[in-house]
Amino acid sequence: MSLSIGMVAGEPSGDLLASRVIAGLRRDETVQCQGIGGPAMQAAGFDAWHPMHALTVFGYVDALKRLPSLLRTYGDVKRRWLASPPSVFVGVDAPDFNLKLELALRQAGTPTVHFVGPSIWAWRYERIHKIREAVSHMLVLFPFEEELYRKEGIPVTYVGHPLADAIPMQPDRAAARQRLGLDADARVLAILPGSRSSEIRILAPRFLQAAQQLQRRDPGLVCVVPMVNAQRRAEFEAILAQYPVPGLRCLTAEDAASGGLPVAWSALEASNAVLVASGTATLEAALFKRPMVISYYLSPWMRRIMAWKSGQQRPYLPWVGLPNVLLRDFAVPELLQDDATPDKLAEATWAALTDDAQAARVEARFAAMHRDLTRDTATLAARAILEVAHGAA
């Protein structure tokens, strides 16, 4: 009997992650995967009823503008799967969309798997109640999440992090510099101010002013800034014109110098240290074993929302950056909110660039973390999904 697997991914990271799992699932040619997905999933044999960008939104304003379209897409896939239930449904990240869909399908008798645990350990812990109702089985990327969900009575499997499988245990700085055309002996700083317009608008001026100070200390310092696309590059370069940094290299995926790799990976691999916005990029920097300074700054209105939300819930972890969360320690500096000043960013980043002993300690801790996260994620996830599907058969 063939298996039908419903799946929804709403972000490029989810598309890539799901594509690897689909490849594992479709080793059995009778397995059919369909739903909402991107080009990587389709290349792996996924039948996309709707393209992934139907769910991709950038911020609250964009979400409000696109709400009618999102509701139509949700209604369409829900109707299809209620009329012809899949053997199992897999929601890949995108919790605001997928948890609602998972609840409807599970209540109708379809087993559900949620792949990539919502960051309830960071904020909105109250979502655990909805997760318990909506999800038959959680697949999580971080080891500490397994214990968290198990304590809440939710079946869970730790599958490791796909970035740990994809990023080499021993980065090749010389090869990365050759790809990017950088001097082998230069001191290189990778600057990653985020992938959203709002992040770039707020963080880029602070990061660039810090870079200006660093270049006054070391005029030979080379700054490399990867951007997710041409639009973000244009936004960044408009800010760069106000805070010029001589010799700064701004790269996008279109640049042949990236060598076919994610452009951020080339920048990180080539660097001596990293100044980075809190987010997945901090984990990438850690997997490349680079010392870093993590920063973030919320707008005043977002701060008010977060302050109110935090008053309603349990206290959260003291760390923001993923490397520190995973290591349960301030292994690298975090400069957040009012501490995210150009002066403080420059001072901390200078230490990351020049303190060789600290860099060696950080590299050793990140290497151990990398080993802990390496689990052949795609194979483990595919196996767990099939077990849930067969267990419900």
UniProtKB/Swiss-Prot annotation:
HAMAP family referenced in this protein's UniProt entry, alphabetically: LpxB (MF_00392)
TM spans (from-to): none
Source organism phylogeny: Bacteria, Pseudomonadati, Pseudomonadota, Betaproteobacteria, Burkholderiales
Catalytic activity: a lipid X + a UDP-2-N,3-O-bis[(3R)-3-hydroxyacyl]-alpha-D-glucosamine = a lipid A disaccharide + UDP + H(+)
Protein keywords: Glycosyltransferase, Lipid A biosynthesis, Lipid biosynthesis, Lipid metabolism, Transferase
GO molecular function, one term: phospholipid binding
Identification of the protein by name: Lipid-A-disaccharide synthase
NCBIfam families the UniProt entry points to: lpxB
Pathway involvement of the protein, from the record: Bacterial outer membrane biogenesis; LPS lipid A biosynthesis
EC identifiers of the protein: 2.4.1.182
Species: Bordetella petrii (strain ATCC BAA-461 / DSM 12804 / CCUG 43448)
Main function: Condensation of UDP-2,3-diacylglucosamine and 2,3-diacylglucosamine-1-phosphate to form lipid A disaccharide, a precursor of lipid A, a phosphorylated glycolipid that anchors the lipopolysaccharide to the outer membrane of the cell.
Any one annotated GO CC term: membrane
Swiss-Prot/TrEMBL GO biological process terms: lipid A biosynthetic process
Cited PANTHER family: LIPID-A-DISACCHARIDE SYNTHASE (PTHR30372), LIPID-A-DISACCHARIDE SYNTHASE, MITOCHONDRIAL-RELATED (PTHR30372:SF4)
Origin: domain of life: Bacteria
Similarity annotation: Belongs to the LpxB family.
Gene: lpxB
Enzyme class: transferase
